[in-house]
Amino acid sequence: MSLKLPEHVAIIMDGNGRWARQRGLPRVAGHYRGAEVAEDIIEYCIELGIKHLTLFAFSTENWNRPKEEVKALFELMENYIRSKREKLYSLGVRVRLIGRRDRLSRGLVNLMEELESDSKDFKNLFLNVAIDYGGRDDILRAVKKIMEVQPSKLDEETFSQFLDLSCSPDPDLLIRTAGEKRISNFLLWNLAYTELYFTDTLWPDFTREEFMKALEDYSRRKRKFGRVLDE
C-alpha cells in the first residue's frame, strides 16, 4: 500500500531542555541540537514531497523562561539564519515568520524579513517558523484586523485570511515530541480537523525514522471531517 502523505505537517518541538539535563549540559545545548534536527527534518520533507512545514520555535508564554535562556534562544535563531540561509535558498525553501513581531529584536525581525523576501519565489517547501506565537493571540490579532469587515461578509474562509497561517492550508498532521499530550496554545483555529500524533521521543533525539513512524500512523487514519465514512 502506498503511503498517504500529509500536505502540511506542524511540529511542536518539545524536550530540548530535558535532553540537555539528562546529559548534564546547559539547556541551550539542547536547543542547538534541536536546531540541527529541525534542519534534517526540513530536508526530509523536501525529499518526501511534503509541501508545508510549520515549526513552533518560541511561544508567547516562553517569555516566562529564565532571561538567560531566552537571550540564548534568540542568539541561536539569529546565528542559525545567518549560517543556514544560503542552504535554505539552495533547497528551494520559502520561509515565513508567523507570530508577533513587535516584541522581537529589530535585528531578528530584519533577518527574518530578508529571508522572507529573498525566498518568496521558492516552492520546494513552504516553511512557517512560529516565533512569539500563541493561538489565542493569533485569533485576537485577526479579530482586530477584521473589525472593519461588514458582519454579513464574515465567514470562516474570510476570517482565516486574517490569521498568521493564511498562506498555508490547515495542517493535516500535528506532531508533538517529548510525551506531552496537549497543543499548548498552538494554531488553535487551524488545528480544528488536524490529526494529532504524540511521541515520547525528545526533539533532539527525533530522527527521520521517528518522523516516518508519524507519517505511517497518519497514513493509516481515515479523516472524517465530521462525516460518516463507510467502514
Curated annotation (Swiss-Prot):
Lineage top rank: taxon: Bacteria
Tagged with keyword Magnesium: yes
CDD domains, sorted: Cis_IPPS
CC cofactor note: Binds 2 magnesium ions per subunit.
InterPro entries: UPP_synth-like, UPP_synth-like_CS, UPP_synth-like_sf
GO biological process: polyprenol biosynthetic process
Required co-factors: Mg(2+)
Positions of Mg(2+) binding: D14, E195
GO molecular function, one term: prenyltransferase activity
Enzyme Commission (EC) number: 2.5.1.-
UniProt: substrate binding residues: 15-19, 27, 31, 59-61, 63, 65, 176, 182-184
Function comment: Catalyzes the condensation of isopentenyl diphosphate (IPP) with allylic pyrophosphates generating different type of terpenoids.
Family in the record: Belongs to the UPP synthase family.
NCBIfam families xrefs: uppS
Protein name (Swiss-Prot/TrEMBL): Isoprenyl transferase
Species this protein is from: Aquifex aeolicus (strain VF5)
Protein's gene: uppS
